[in-house]
Amino acid sequence: MPRSMKNDNFIDKTFTVMADLILKLMPGVSPEQKKAFAYYRDGMAAQSEGEYAEALENYREALALEQDDEDRSYILYNMGLIYQSNGELDKALEYYHQALELNPRLCSALNNIAVLLHHKGEQSLQAGDEETAEALFDEAAQYWIRAIRIAPNNYIEAQNWLKTTGRANLELY
């Protein structure tokens, strides 16, 4: 039974009913698109409740049905979030990169890649590998710069880090 049918939360049920009605009324929406949306919606619901295995299962189903690249990018991005939450950072990076291939302006994926690269840089620094750490920090900076160029009012903390570490590109500001 789909998650949307067994949820006891009134607000979630209301959202589900409204989303289903909107889908039914939208002209030109194929049955596959409707199924993809239902799986995506159920994946988001499961993810918000910490049911990551169920969320991934729903996202995989949505990904198999979804044809739109931008929609696919958000599915992949959410899968990356789950892997990041589970501490599977390399797998999270893979999914964020796949999302960016489909949607190069997905700022949240750019930011999350930068955050993970920065984290890996910190780990390398703690392990005494300054050369690897600096390379990872430089790579993180490039992703943050891309995100800031798209959304200049976001990522203030990243902008400050770029400035204080001398990695701020003057063209950025």
Swiss-Prot record:
Keyword Disulfide bond annotated: no
Tell me where it resides: Cellular thylakoid membrane
Q: What cellular-component terms does GO give this entry? A: plasma membrane-derived thylakoid membrane
Which keywords label this protein? Membrane, Photosynthesis, Repeat, Thylakoid, TPR repeat
Give GO terms for biological process.
photosynthesis
Where do the TPR repeats start and stop? 36-69, 73-106, 121-154
The way this protein sits in the membrane is described as: Peripheral membrane protein
Kindly indicate whether the keyword Transport belongs to this entry. no
Q: Gene3D superfamilies under this entry? A: Tetratricopeptide repeat domain (1.25.40.10)
Q: What is its main location?
A: membrane
Entries under NCBIfam families matching the protein: PRK02603.1 (NF002725)
The record's similarity note reads:
Belongs to the Ycf3 family.
Its biological purpose is as follows:
Essential for the assembly of the photosystem I (PSI) complex. May act as a chaperone-like factor to guide the assembly of the PSI subunits.
Protein name (record): Photosystem I assembly protein Ycf3
Q: What is the lineage of its organism?
A: Bacteria, Bacillati, Cyanobacteriota, Cyanophyceae, Synechococcales
